[in-house]
Regions:
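Bacterial N-terminal signal peptides
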Residues: 1-5
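Hydrophobic alpha-helical membrane segments
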Residues: 7-113
Length: 113
């Protein structure tokens, strides 16, 4: 609810394209979250996290806190940035998260919560 209210309150100055890229970046973030949650159930298969912030074997709780914080921070940073800087940031986040998701799927992780 908080995120929804914040988005509705703040993104009036965003272009239609920026809004679409913001949604796309969130889709990639949630897909990364989902595949990484799958990994937490499969450490016994040799999977390890490579994000140094999370450590090699984060708990599901730590992972959830990380991604919720990331999503909230992502909105506020996107809203703070203006014009072309906002667009470059959104393209970059979408590409980086998309690459992480592609890698996770490639190594056998699944999209599931």
């Amino acid at each position: 609810m908080f995120i929804s209210t914040a988005v509705n309150a703040g993104w009036q100055d965003w272009t239609h394209e920026q809004k679409r890229w913001y949604v796309a970046s969130n889709v990639m973030l949630v897909a990364d979250w989902s595949t990484t949650r799958d990994m937490t159930r499969r450490y016994d298969e040799g999977y390890r996290e490579i994000n140094p912030i999370l450590g090699s074997r984060p708990s599901t709780d730590k992972l959830d806190l990380y991604f919720v914080t990331y999503l909230i921070g992502h909105y506020f940073l996107t809203d703070y940035l203006q014009g072309r800087n906002r667009e470059i940031y959104l393209y970059t986040i979408t590409a980086v998260e998309g690459a992480a998701v592609a890698n996770n799927l490639n190594i056998g992780l699944r999209l599931r919560f």
